[in-house]
Amino acid sequence: MSRLEELIAELCPNGVEYKKLGDIAAISRGGNLQKKDFCAEGVPCIHYGQIYTRYGLFADRTFTFISEDCAKKQKIAYPNDIVMAVTSENIEDICKCVAWLGESTIAVSGHTAIIHHSQNAKYLTYYFHTQMFATQKRRLAHGTKVMEVTPDTLNSVIVPIPPLQVQSEIVKILDNFTELTAELTAELTARRKQYEYYRSAILRSSNTTTEKTLGEICDFVRGPFGGSLKKENFSKEGYAVYELQHAIYGDFKFRYFVDKAKYDVM
């Protein structure tokens, strides 16, 4: 039994409780700061557009700042709050959010919902990127060219709320998975660059390479049509029969074989 299963059995043996977001969080609208308010240093801030372009799921520092005078007029998010973009050009991106894990308060722009709560911020943020939440947000979104979810309507969103210890264990598992995914992506990117380098080196024209048609270096033989191979031709062992599915799916588990006599006449 995994640690997560042990915690669930101990702390919520009758199942996880589901609650409305409005019952566990206070949801407010963002302020009215704009990109023209940005300055080199000052009060950290998040603009809703940056949630789509610059932030991942979590952040402990911002990319931009505003002056203290400007910040006095803005809406504030506190550590552990979640900032959600509620305006988007498409339904898939709407309600993308970032958990603020920094130590200070931050100013937040309009077109956002600030979710203040006492749960595990990373757990809620992971949940807000699940298919379960996506199904609910689709019902709340409205608009044509620009999609919007009114912050007040987020109160009705249903959220599974296990005990905090369970939330923490779930976050640990998802963090590890995210890290492994990032490492795999980096490895694949490096391999792709390596492949492209060698491909370019091989194909680059030089005095040591020549170009030939595929027909000059390969022999092509048409495979037999279905009528050429019948069940009575198959044997339990011998020469493997290569099927279309092997080429399509890359699965080389051979089902059929023919003996040497049949192989020689094909």
Give each language-model segment a name.
Residues 15-17, 155-192, 196, 209:
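Amphipathic alpha-helical segments
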Residues 8-31, 204-225:
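Non-catalytic DNA-recognition/assembly elements of restriction-modification systems
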Residues 150, 163, 201, 207-210:
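Structural preference for solvent-exposed beta-strand-turn elements
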Residues 47, 62, 68-131, 243-245, ...:
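A short beta-sheet element
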Residues 16-21, 43, 77, 81-83, ...:
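Short, structured motif recognition centered on aromatic/hydrophobic residues
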Residues 22-25, 34-67, 78, 215-218, ...:
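DNA target-recognition patches
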Residues 10, 32-33, 70-71, 101, ...:
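Short, solvent-exposed loop/turn positions at domain surfaces
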Residues 105-111, 142-162:
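A short glycine-rich beta-alpha junction/loop motif
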